[in-house]
Amino acid sequence: MIPRWQPASIPLLLHLDTLRCHHVSVQPPRATMTSLNIKEEDIPRLDGKVVVISGGASGIGLAAANIFARAGAKIFLFDRNPPDSGEAPENSTFIKADITSWAELKAAFAQAGHVDIAVANAGVSEEQPYFEDTFDEQGELKEPGFAVVDVNFKGTVMFTKLAVSYMRKQGKGGSVVITASATGYAPEQNLPVYSAIKSGLVGLVRSLRSTLPRFDISINAVAPAATITKLLPMDIAGPLMAAGLPVSSAHMVGLAVVYSAVARQPRMVETYGKENVLDLESKWNGRTILTLGEHYTELEEKLADLRPVWFGWRNTDLTKKQQATADFR
């Protein structure tokens, strides 16, 4: 059974399709974010499906791999180092690959050969306080490192490009899921570049959600808050938990990743350009699931519904018309 999202009871919304500039006097729509109840037993069988996961040897990637594998999928784990002994599922193959290398990523996809589901999960944290002054041996301001940019943004874009290319050529559709971050919506002041990049990954999902469905390809994101992985080991997570703050397990986030790849939706997040049918049942697409402690929340639909409020009614109407004029489909 493919999990199908059921909307919570919310006040009636005024959708963009009915907006006109003279509606500025109308009461703005109200909406609450949609809570999700995701259970592993709701994941359908995935026998015969091939899943590729970057950063798949540990943390969220490995947790998702084990869930996919229990559903019957064949898994390819792309990473710089193999999983610890005994942690990878039996029906998985490790492929050594640096996500910042186009050549290595191409070779990894070629070795997998076929792709039904692609999870762009590899990521690193900021290696330095980016906007503090550091100096070289001559006392000159030192150029900062760009690993967080290369891995988290460039690598994710390259991985996604290759995945979409394979899915288009195969002609059988597919699903792309990107591991973003809660910091993409609520930035951390001590992680400014990391937060900006994760916001950019959410932007990538928004930019592609209207075009990829032409090929029966969906794209979604998961936005983990504090999660116990190598980026947030237990000795750091412990004080958060002791203070009563929510911390997620890698398994919980991994389950959101798998759900995002297989679920269906009763309506689109929003229409774009020439589109005029919002209530269209289809694959889960263009959405982000926030994972916070043991709670799942879908963010994008309500943000889209409230666009006239935060973007402006007139701005929304005119932008919609501009998009329709430039819509190449």
Swiss-Prot record:
Membrane topology reported for the UniProt record: Single-pass membrane protein
Organism taxonomic ancestry: Eukaryota, Fungi, Dikarya, Ascomycota, Pezizomycotina
GO MF entry, a single one: oxidoreductase activity
Binding site residues for NADP(+): 58, 60, 81, 98, 121, 161, 194, 198, 229
Keywords attached to this entry: Glycoprotein, Membrane, NADP, Oxidoreductase, Transmembrane, Transmembrane helix
Location of this chain's protein in the cell: Membrane
PANTHER family hit by this protein: 3-OXOACYL-(ACYL-CARRIER-PROTEIN) REDUCTASE (AFU_ORTHOLOGUE AFUA_6G11210), NAD(P)-BINDING PROTEIN
InterPro entries the record matches: NAD(P)-bd_dom_sf, SDR_fam
GO cellular component, one term: membrane
Functional summary from the UniProt entry: Short-chain dehydrogenase/reductase; part of the gene cluster that mediates the biosynthesis of PR-toxin, a bicyclic sesquiterpene belonging to the eremophilane class and acting as a mycotoxin. The first step of the pathway is catalyzed by the aristolochene synthase which performs the cyclization of trans,trans-farnesyl diphosphate (FPP) to the bicyclic sesquiterpene aristolochene. Following the formation of aristolochene, the non-oxygenated aristolochene is converted to the trioxygenated intermediate eremofortin B, via 7-epi-neopetasone.
Record-annotated active site: 194, 198
Family membership noted in the UniProt record: Belongs to the short-chain dehydrogenases/reductases (SDR) family.
Enzyme class: oxidoreductase
Pathway: Sesquiterpene biosynthesis
Effect of inactivating the gene: Reduces the production of PR-toxin and leads to a large increase in mycophenolic acid production.
Transmembrane regions listed in the UniProt entry: 238-258
UniProt-recorded name of the protein: Short-chain dehydrogenase/reductase prx4
The UniProt record lists the keyword Cell membrane: no
Domain of life: Eukaryota
Residues modified by glycosylation: 91
UniProt-listed Enzyme Commission number(s): 1.1.99.-
